[in-house]
Amino acid sequence: MAKSTQSIEPNIADLVNSWLKSYQLDYKLEQEPLNDEIDKALKDYFTKNGGAGANRPDAKLLLQDKNLDYYPILIEYKGYPDKLVKKDSEDNVENRTAKNEPHFKNINTFAVNGAVHYANALLHHTSFTDIIAIGVIGEKDNKGNIIPKIGVYYVAKANLGAGQEVAQFTDLSFLKKENFDAFVQQVKSLSLSPEEFERIKQQREQEIDASLTKLNNDIYENEKGLGENDRVLQAQGSVFTNKYAEGY
């Protein structure tokens, strides 16, 4: 019988948290509050399992660049060497199924997918439009040293929350105060081709349509006591909420 690989997530957490501490950054761990707006968004957004509760990134921080713009940083750790990111056939972070439903298995299993999920919570429920989602995994070499692997993704209103890989990094020193402005410039240089943008936009519109279909069915089943006009008004309110959240 093959020997199962043991998760080293606690070691990954120790390593990365030690980096953040050495950079003298004010980072917060899972259940620690960061910012009222961010904390509420993580609480209100659907969880990685699809239910109610709270979304808890392994680490989170809020950094400011030279233009006084704030960037939430959301970090997720996984303890297996093959659990950094799961992408679809278009090379996008695969957080939706073929039926345009949340891909909870990927969101739960892969570090970047989880971090991008958290970032979308902020896009939907806060005033922040530019978020950095970071996934970190790793493995031990034959001497017991941790060899980390890092995925850094830009999740923004400009890319409709899809997430774009920024670059390859071996640590998180780009978050240090003296390096952060250069990192922001690098992030801002990213763009989607018109074809990529249109494809993602169509996917987002399909997600909204699927959500509204489900909403309509739920209203019909759960609010049969309402008059037709009441049901229409309730549905319209949800349409506007969804459209606003998606930035259309």
Task: Describe the function of each predicted region.
Residues 1-132, 137-151, 159-160:
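A short, conserved, highly charged catalytic patch centered on acidic carboxylates
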Residues 179-248:
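Non-catalytic nucleic-acid substrate-recognition regions in nucleic-acid-modifying enzymes
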